[in-house]
């Protein structure tokens, strides 16, 4: 049997399972309804394809019909095309063949975000910030990001030619690269929060194949390198992944025989309960799990289990709330159907699905109201609620970005300035952005004609247009005064938002010299969620009080 058919997934990405043949114990009238309506559909499709006044594309008709049908269900039930199938395969195996490049769109250009250390692109000297011009002789201006990825990936031991433009070098640079098998690391960083700390930190990007083994290796490395007294597990912006890896990760922190998650659906074959099965690697030390609204599905399984078992303090923001299980059933021509078949439940019995897809034409999808949220109890008797994701034990409000910071990020100004700075400075040993560097950044923005509008200016501009059309000179005077005040307000934005801008600029430049790991290491010192976790892990009395530990 194809290995693809054996894989099990649960995620904001998907869950792959093998399902039995068709409808188990289905009612006879259901079979008749399926046959009747399929016959009607087939006749309509055949008639339209052959007799419609204009020539139609049968494939497009079918895809439109399928998407319309699935669109009446939930957003996770979808038809998967060949490209998406390849992406699922990467999640399932944590491997693909490529040159080791992360690329993305920045400021209207396709750029190298980061070369992956140890692979062809990194070895040959491709750098973060390089602007892609051609891939295998094709201009990137004519390609989508998916098409560029298709060009970079392929069979192992095959060639890729890449032409890039690098700041400070006049002529484009040609790279001849070789595709090779690339192992996707699900644990993107692990270490102590600072060199003198006994609190470890593990960042999990997704729950792909071998995640639990990667977490175990990270734990053993931390225990070997120092006295591991506490642990922070970072699941922020983790969309999910393999169900087995979520269970295997909880396995590392709980003794055998503890329930982790159960799934329940209309078909009894989709009902399962998963337990821990191996001796824990880190059974007793303090634990904190970081979540935000980008944490979904498999990451919510891990957080929900550790919360219900009173094994960890949950810190951050409420998680996404995806409590639906999908299977991926392979179809003809390398396509597949991702279909919701069940809901999952944490050990306390709660389902954390935040949106109720009722299929009611009058109401449709709606969030579960607070009045319908049911209370459950954790192992130690704490009250938790279902129906709205995983709620943190310690809520940390997300930091609000200023309008200037948002504009700088949206226009990739930090990114492109870092590329220029790196070209002119072979080393970077500073612990912060100096005044001279900050001034250089502002000069760069002026030279690039950096511009942005705040909402008040946009509204004022519309009002000006209306007043001009009425020739109301008197009304224009206060409008012009207000416009001048808004300009001055914007001019002072650099002073108001300077600390945050300096921090973001520092981290972007640092990543060019020390990679993403160096950037993450530096971020730990100022990350409010991490610092909150450190405080609670250092305060045993507060930690036990939150988890209702009975001494």
Regions found by a protein language model. Name each.
Residues 1-5:
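Short, Lys/Arg-rich N-terminal segment immediately upstream of the first membrane anchor
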Residues 9-24:
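Hydrophobic membrane-insertion alpha-helices, especially the h-region
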Residues 23-37, 41, 45-53, 57-58, ...:
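Cleft-lining beta-strand/loop regions that shape enzyme active-site pockets
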Residues 52-113, 157-189, 524-534, 542-549:
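Extended, small/polar residue-biased N-terminal targeting/export presequences
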Residues 114, 143, 176, 340, ...:
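Short linear motifs in exposed loops
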Residues 298, 310-311, 315-317, 321-382, ...:
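Polar, glycine-rich mid-to-C-terminal structural blocks
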Residues 351-551:
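Conserved functional hotspot residues or short segments at active or partner-binding sites
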């Amino acid at each position: 049997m194809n290995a693809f058919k054996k894989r099990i997934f649960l995620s904001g990405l998907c869950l792959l399972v093998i399902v039995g043949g068709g409808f188990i114990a289905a009612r006879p009238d259901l079979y008749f309804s399926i046959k009747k309506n399929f016959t009607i559909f087939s006749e309509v499709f055949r008639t339209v394809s052959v007799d419609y006044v204009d020539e139609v594309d049968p494939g497009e008709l079918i895809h439109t019909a399928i998407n319309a049908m699935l669109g009446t269900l939930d957003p996770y039930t979808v038809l998967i095309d060949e490209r998406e199938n390849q992406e699922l395969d990467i999640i399932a195996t944590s491997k693909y063949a490529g040159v080791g490049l992360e690329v993305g769109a920045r400021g209207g250009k396709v750029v190298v975000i980061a070369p992956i250390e140890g692979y062809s692109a990194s070895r040959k000297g491709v750098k973060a910030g390089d602007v892609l011009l051609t891939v295998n002789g094709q201009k990137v201006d004519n390609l989508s990001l998916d098409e560029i990825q298709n060009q970079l990936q392929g069979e192992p031991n095959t060639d890729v030619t890449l032409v890039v433009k690098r700041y400070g070098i006049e002529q484009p640079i040609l790279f001849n690269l070789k595709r090779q098998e690339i192992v996707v690391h699900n644990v993107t960083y692990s270490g102590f929060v600072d060199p003198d700390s006994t609190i470890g930190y593990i960042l999990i990007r997704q729950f792909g194949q071998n995640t639990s083994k990667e977490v175990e290796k990270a734990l053993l490395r931390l225990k070997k390198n120092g006295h591991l007294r506490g642990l922070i597990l970072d699941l922020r912006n983790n969309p999910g992944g393999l169900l087995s890896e979520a269970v295997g990760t909880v396995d590392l922190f709980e003794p055998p025989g503890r329930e982790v998650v159960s799934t329940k659906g209309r078909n009894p074959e989709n009902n399962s309960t998963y337990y821990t099965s191996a001796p824990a690697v880190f059974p007793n030390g303090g634990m904190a799990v970081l979540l935000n609204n980008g944490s979904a599905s498999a990451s919510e399984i891990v957080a929900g289990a550790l919360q219900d078992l009173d094994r960890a303090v949950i810190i951050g923001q409420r998680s996404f709330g995806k409590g639906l299980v999908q299977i991926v059933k392979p179809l003809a021509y390398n396509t597949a159907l991702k279909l919701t078949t069940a809901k999952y439940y944490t050990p306390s019995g709660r389902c954390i699905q935040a949106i109720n897809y009722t299929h009611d034409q009058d109401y449709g999808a709606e969030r579960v109201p607070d009045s319908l949220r049911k209370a459950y109890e954790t192992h130690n008797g704490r009250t938790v609620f279902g129906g709205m994701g995983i709620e943190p034990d310690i809520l940390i409000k997300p930091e609000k970005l200023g309008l200037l910071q948002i504009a700088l990020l949206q226009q990739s100004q930090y990114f492109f300035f870092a590329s220029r700075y790196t070209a002119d400075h072979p080393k970077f040993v500073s612990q912060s952005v100096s005044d001279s560097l900050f001034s250089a950044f502002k000069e760069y923005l002026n030279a690039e004609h950096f511009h942005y509008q705040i909402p008040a200016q946009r509204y004022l501009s519309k009002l000006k247009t209306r007043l001009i059309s009425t020739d109301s000179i008197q009304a224009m005077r206060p409008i012009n005064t207000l416009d001048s005040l808004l300009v001055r307000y914007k001019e002072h934005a650099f002073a108001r938002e300077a600390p945050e801008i300096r921090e973001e600029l520092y981290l972007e430049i640092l990543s060019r010299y020390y990679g993403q790991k160096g950037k993450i290491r530096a971020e730990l010192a100022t990350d409010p969620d991490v610092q909150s976790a450190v405080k609670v892990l250092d305060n045993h009395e507060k930690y036990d009080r939150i988890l209702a530990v009975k001494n």
